[in-house]
C-alpha cells in the first residue's frame, strides 16, 4: 500500500515520458505496485511540458519564449527559466529542476490563469477521454507534432485504439479526402 496522501498531484517537466518511468521501475523492483502511487486515493499526474506547449501555441502573451538559432521554438526547462529570469541553478540537478518547474508553473498560472486552470482540470485521463469521445475536434499538443505549429494541432477521434486505452486521432490540418484512399 502506498503511504502518500490522497489528492496528491505529481507535477513534473517531461515527467510522464521520463521521470514516471523510473518511478514505476523503482516500485516494480521493490515489489510495489508500479502504478498505484499515481492513481490511488484520487492522486494524479500533470506534465508541465504539455502545458508549456499548449500555452506557447494558444496564449503566449506575457511569457518570454526561447528560440533556437535556427528559428525553431525551444521548450527546454533551462532555456525557459533563463529567458524568464526564473531560478534554475543547474540543469538536470533534481532540486534545481524542481525549483524551476515550480517557478515556471507559477509564471504560466500568473500570465494565463484561465488556460492554466482549464489544463489542470483535465489532467486525469478520464477527463481527457470525455473530450476525445465527445465527437468534436479538439486541440492537442504532443512532442510528436512539428515545431512549425508549436507541437500543437487540431485533431478528431477516428477510432478507439485496438490495444490500449485511448484513441487514434486524425490531424485536421491535412486533407481528409486524399488520405481516405491510403
Question: Where are the model-predicted features located?
Answer:
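Metal-dependent phosphoesterase core characteristic of DEDDh/y 3'-5' exonuclease domains
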Residues: 6-114, 119-122
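Acidic two-metal-ion nuclease catalytic site recognized across multiple nuclease folds
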Residues: 106-181
Amino acid at each position: 500500500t502506498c503511504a502518500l496522501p490522497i489528492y496528491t498531484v505529481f507535477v513534473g517537466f517531461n515527467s510522464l515520458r521520463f521521470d514516471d518511468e523510473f518511478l514505476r521501475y523503482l516500485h516494480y523492483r521493490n515489489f510495489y505496485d508500479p502504478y498505484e502511487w499515481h492513481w490511488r486515493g484520487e492522486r494524479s499526474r500533470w506534465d508541465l511540458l504539455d502545458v508549456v506547449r499548449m500555452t506557447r501555441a494558444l496564449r503566449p502573451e506575457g511569457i518570454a519564449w526561447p528560440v533556437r538559432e535556427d528559428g525553431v521554438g525551444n521548450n527546454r526547462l533551462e532555456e525557459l527559466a533563463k529567458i524568464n529570469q526564473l531560478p534554475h541553478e543547474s540543469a538536470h540537478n533534481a532540486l534545481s529542476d524542481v525549483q524551476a518547474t515550480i517557478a515556471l508553473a507559477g509564471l504560466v498560472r500568473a500570465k494565463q490563469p484561465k488556460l492554466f486552470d482549464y489544463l489542470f482540470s483535465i489532467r486525469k485521463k478520464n477527463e481527457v477521454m470525455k473530450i476525445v469521445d465527445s465527437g468534436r475536434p479538439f486541440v492537442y499538443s504532443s512532442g510528436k507534432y512539428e515545431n512549425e505549429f508549436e507541437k500543437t494541432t487540431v485533431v478528431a477521434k477516428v477510432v478507439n485504439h485496438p490495444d490500449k486505452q485511448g484513441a487514434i486521432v486524425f490531424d485536421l490540418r491535412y486533407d481528409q479526402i486524399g488520405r481516405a484512399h491510403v
